């Protein structure tokens, strides 16, 4: 078989067709703290100096990021994340409320009050307060989510932009904030989950509004680029180690109808590879996600009991899989790496519909030489 382009390889893999080999990539960029550690462990400084900033769409805000573009250095298949701004416009004024030599408490551009430990960019901040407490707050913040605001699209959005994307041979990926993720960003996890029971009418309004907002915000983008958008991810993070934050019953009542609307719009425009991004153990919700039009999951966090081999056996070709390489095994060393890869890749490569990737961001406790060994060993199974 002749060598495929990254896009051809991705699409063949995701459609259970033959490819020259599996894609080699990290589905999430390698973060700053990890790169800083690797520079002390052998990563050439020349590979970092001069790197341009890339755009990375985070949960609610599109932002310019200092993530290192590792595609060329490691020989990854390129995956480009499209930038549509699904965040509040105008942004909230970022301001510092308290600062010491150890931490800083601030209001961020999304309106969230949080505590940041100085000198650490990897990991989660401590979230302290959110903008929405009740229906009055919700009605007020809704004004910041106008799908017709032209600032939501790239500055160079034009016919030339479209023509340029049609010439690319790598994967084009659109990330959007999902329904649970949005409620969490607006209210905080515990208050939002409580709202499903304490004020179901408010929850229903948030879910309905968000489905309409997503569709109308991306409508021109999707209807113009159509199937040149190779895949879509709906970011949720609605599970933890021991299961989802909400029950299947709650998902079915509040989220399933909205999932069907969004995925129906995407599929109508030729986009049929639709992932949900959720850390933790999301297994109880998989049948409902499939019913809602989703056909892929990542990052399949091993520490939460997610296992790609088991999922492939249970769901067959109905479910696409990305991730599930245990970050802890890569940190441990060669023997653990070989066991992790050897126990999964032979079967998953044969069955198809799977792309190996570490089961979240590459953390700074993975030594550089371990990561290089992991990639070299992984290539034997692609």
Regions found by a protein language model. Give the residues of each.
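Active-site loop segments of alpha/beta catalytic cores
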Residues: 1-45, 98, 104-107, 113-120, ...
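Short acidic, Pro/Gly- and aromatic-enriched capping/linker segments at domain boundaries
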Residues: 88-104
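Segments that shape or occlude catalytic/ligand-binding pockets
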Residues: 35-93
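Compositionally biased intrinsically disordered low-complexity regions
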Residues: 124-125
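Residue-level detector of alpha-helical segments with a strong bias toward transmembrane helices
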Residues: 85, 120-121
């Amino acid at each position: 078989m002749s060598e495929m382009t990254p896009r051809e390889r991705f699409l063949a893999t995701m459609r259970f067709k033959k490819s020259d080999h599996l894609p080699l990539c990290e589905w999430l960029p390698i973060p700053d703290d990890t790169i800083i550690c690797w520079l002390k462990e052998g990563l050439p400084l020349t590979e970092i100096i001069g790197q341009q900033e890339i755009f990375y769409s985070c949960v609610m805000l599109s932002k310019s990021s200092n993530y290192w573009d590792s595609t060329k250095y490691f020989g990854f298949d390129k995956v480009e994340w499209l930038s549509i701004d699904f965040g509040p416009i105008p942004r909230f004024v970022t301001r510092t409320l308290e600062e010491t030599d150890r931490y800083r408490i601030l209001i961020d551009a999304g309106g969230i009050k949080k505590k940041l430990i100085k000198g650490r960019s990897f990991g989660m901040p401590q979230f302290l307060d959110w903008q929405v407490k009740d229906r009055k707050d919700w009605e007020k913040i809704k004004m910041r989510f106008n799908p017709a605001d032209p600032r939501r699209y790239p500055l160079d959005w034009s016919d030339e932009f479209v023509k340029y994307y049609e010439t690319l041979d790598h994967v084009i990926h659109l990330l959007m904030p999902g329904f649970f993720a949005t409620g969490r960003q607006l209210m905080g996890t515990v208050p939002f989950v409580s709202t499903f029971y304490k004020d179901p009418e408010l929850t229903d309004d948030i879910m309905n509004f968000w489905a309409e907002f997503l569709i109308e915000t991306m409508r021109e983008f999707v209807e113009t680029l159509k199937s040149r958008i190779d895949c879509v991810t709906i970011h949720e993070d609605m599970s933890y180690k021991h299961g989802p934050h909400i029950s299947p019953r709650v998902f079915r009542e509040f989220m399933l109808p909205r999932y069907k609307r969004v995925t129906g719009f995407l599929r109508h425009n030729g986009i049929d590879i639709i992932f949900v991004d959720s850390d933790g153990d999301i297994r109880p919700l998989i049948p409902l996600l499939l019913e809602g039009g989703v056909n892929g999951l990542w990052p399949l966090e091993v520490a939460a009991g997610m296992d790609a081999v088991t999922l492939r056996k249970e769901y067959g070709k109905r479910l696409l899989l990305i991730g599930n390489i245990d970050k802890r095994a890569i940190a441990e060393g060669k023997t653990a790496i070989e066991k992790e890869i050897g126990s999964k890749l032979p079967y998953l490569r044969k069955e198809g519909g799977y792309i190996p990737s570490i089961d979240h961001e590459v953390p700074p406790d993975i030594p550089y030489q371990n990561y290089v060994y992991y990639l070299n060993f992984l290539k034997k199974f692609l």
